Structures are given as C-alpha cells and as structure tokens.
Amino acid sequence: MTYLLIAALACERLTTVAVPHAVVTSAQSVAAGALAEFNTLPALCRVAATLTPSPDSDIKMELWLPAANWNGKFQEVGNGAFSGSIALPAMAAAVRRGYAAASTDTGHTGNTAGFALGHPEKVIDFGWRAVHETAVAS
C-alpha cells in the first residue's frame, strides 16, 4: 500500500473517533487538486464536526489534515467580526504551507449578531468557546 492510500483509510476512520461534546459528521480523503475552489491544494483529509459544549451550542468546525508533508504544526484560523462561517480560504493557505488547519463558524451562520438575542450560551460560544472547543477537538 502507498502512504496516501494508508492515509486515506485512516482518514475515513475518523468518523468513529469519540470526542467529548462532538460528533464527527464526515471524514473524507480529498485528492490533490480535487477541490475546485482550491485546485492547488495537496491531498488532504477533510473532517467536519458539530460541537455541543452546552445544550444551546451548535458549533460547526472543519479540520484539514495534509495527507503528506505535514510540518508537524497546527494552525486554527479565524473569521472577522460577526462572521459565522468556516474560513476555507485561510485553511487552504495553511494547508499549502504544510499545517494541519481548523476553523469554526463560532456557533452561528451569517454575519449579524441576531444569533445572540436570548441565547447567552451562544454569546459564550462566539466570544471564545467555539475557538477553544475547535482546538481541543482537533
């Protein structure tokens, strides 16, 4: 077996990993250049998960793991202001440099603060917990 095939098999098995307050929703091997919007990426393992550290939490995250030439480092990338989206372009830049990269939607979608009204736990998710939980789950 080649290294990339072994890495692909290991990637698919990440859906069975038990992570506190998390459900791994997908883990798929992505061939080099296969993501249309990021066609210069090397082969990677793309993992998606939902984190629920509180009953009101609904934090989405992705983790991209280089299939080869990992530099041994992890980089979590952020998003700006009230942005509730996973920062895929920043993750792609990190993976191109050999990093394992992760990002979170900070527990909401969209770019307004409406998610926070009447949801103090979501404010905590946005303020710090989503980033922390993403790093821990990664």
At which residue positions do the language-model features occur?
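Positively charged n-region of N-terminal signal peptides that target proteins for export
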Residues: 1-4
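Catalytic-loop region of hydrolases
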Residues: 6-73, 77, 89
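Cap/lid segment of the alpha/beta-hydrolase catalytic domain
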Residues: 80-137
